[in-house]
Design a protein with these regions (language model features):
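Transmembrane alpha-helices of multi-pass inner-membrane enzymes
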Residues: 120-123, 137-141, 263-272, 277-319
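Alpha-helical transmembrane segments of multi-pass inner-membrane proteins
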Residues: 5-55, 61-130, 137-141, 150, ...
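A membrane-periplasm/extracellular boundary helix in multi-pass inner-membrane enzymes
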Residues: 43, 47-52, 105-110, 127-177, ...
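Membrane-interface catalytic loops of GT-C/OST-like multi-pass glycosylation enzymes that act
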Residues: 66, 111-114, 212-214, 276-287
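Helical hairpin unit composed of two closely spaced alpha helices linked by a short loop
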Residues: 235-239
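TM-adjacent membrane-interface loops and short helices in multi-pass inner/ER membrane proteins
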Residues: 160-220, 224-231
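Membrane-interface "helix-start" segments
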Residues: 252-262
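Membrane-anchoring hydrophobic segments
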Residues: 1-4, 310-331
Length: 331
């Protein structure tokens, strides 16, 4: 029941946002609040690094969820990079890239492999869609060339543990290398999910009607069947198509970066949900549906803003005597 309420909550967030923003000033305040929240969360994450534990979100108690915090950080990182690539001046670009660096630090220390993988389609989307793609390509090449020199030891150890360690190996292999037991357990849950789905292929077992599994697509398939999975994929397709149209429509405007970053963040969430229940997690979905609502209403909001009125300068009209006309001269 409460899982169903969570799904309903996200649509409530979407419709509340769409119906409550009527002018750009409201939009700017809400976006500023979202970005400030991201900055504060990133700083709190950085402060956790000296403890030696995996970085997680604030106020989670003793056992946090680094994977979900990493998903949130990847989503917001995409928005920030979108703003950076669309910035018109060098100081603004530097400011946005500094903000991005602030997010990358705790993202690395979450040690969330799913979140790291989600950054790949995010960067690829920015490379494909942004005219300034060379900046991203250059940054990626530098990271690949010198990453082993400046990457934190815990990050390198996490990578090695996944594929190269000699202990805690599971039954599955990637490229000839056996993966760790954690990844193997996740793959086992997927296999169990498919085995269960075969018994109820069309409508599934209902929400929470099957065992827990950390994979959104498999979970939807098992709980809602083929019909539910088709509806879920259709929803994702409609979100992408709408956002892509908005991105084209707002090209060159002050919201180009937001639309571009949202598309990249959406691509990241698709990858993230392969290894997590991304579209259920409150920490990720509340900002996601908030941003989705903003992207949806942006074209109407920008069009509805009144255009600046031309200045009226008192001057004689052509062919008229003094005081017989006022010519409207645009600034």
């Amino acid at each position: 029941f409460f899982f169903v309420l969570k799904y309903i909550e996200y649509f409530v967030v979407f419709f509340m946002t769409v119906n409550s923003i009527h002018e750009e000033r409201q939009l700017q305040r809400l976006l500023a609040t979202a970005l400030a929240t991201c900055a504060i969360s990133s700083l709190i994450g950085i402060l956790q690094i000296p403890s030696g534990e995996r970085v997680s979100a604030p106020f989670e108690g003793q056992y946090g969820e680094p994977n979900t915090f990493g998903g949130y950080l990847v989503l917001m990182l995409a928005i920030i990079l979108g703003y950076a690539l669309a910035a018109k001046t060098l100081p603004r670009q530097i400011g946005w890239y500094a903000f991005a660096a602030l997010i990358v630090i705790p993202l690395l220390f979450t040690l969330s492999r799913t979140s790291w993988l989600a950054a790949i389609p995010m960067l690829l989307t920015l490379i494909v869609l942004s005219p300034r793609r060379l900046i991203i390509i250059g940054g990626v090449l530098l990271a690949l060339a010198f990453g082993s020199s400046f990457m934190p030891k815990s990050v390198i150890d996490r990578y090695n543990y996944t594929l190269n360690a000699k202990v805690d190996r599971g039954d599955y292999a990637i490229g000839g290398a056996k993966v760790d037991t954690s990844t193997s357990a996740r793959l086992d849950s997927w296999k169990q999910g498919f085995d269960g789905w075969v018994k109820r292929p069309f409508f599934g077992y209902g929400v929470t009607g099957f065992g827990f599994m950390d994979a959104q697509f498999v979970r939807v398939l098992v709980e809602a069947g083929l019909f539910g999975l088709a509806a879920f994929i259709w929803l994702l397709y409609r979100i992408w198509r709408t956002a892509r149209g908005v991105c084209r429509q707002l090209a060159g405007s002050r919201y180009e970066g937001l639309a571009l970053g949202y598309l990249a963040g959406f691509a990241a969430m698709i990858m993230h949900c392969i290894g997590a229940n991304t579209f259920i997690i409150v920490r990720i979905m509340e900002p996601f549906w908030f941003l989705t609502a903003i992207i949806t209403l942006l074209p109407a909001l920008v069009v509805s803003e009144p255009a600046p009125q031309p200045a009226l300068l008192a001057s004689p009209a052509v062919g008229a005597g003094p005081g017989h006309g006022i010519a409207a001269i645009p600034r």
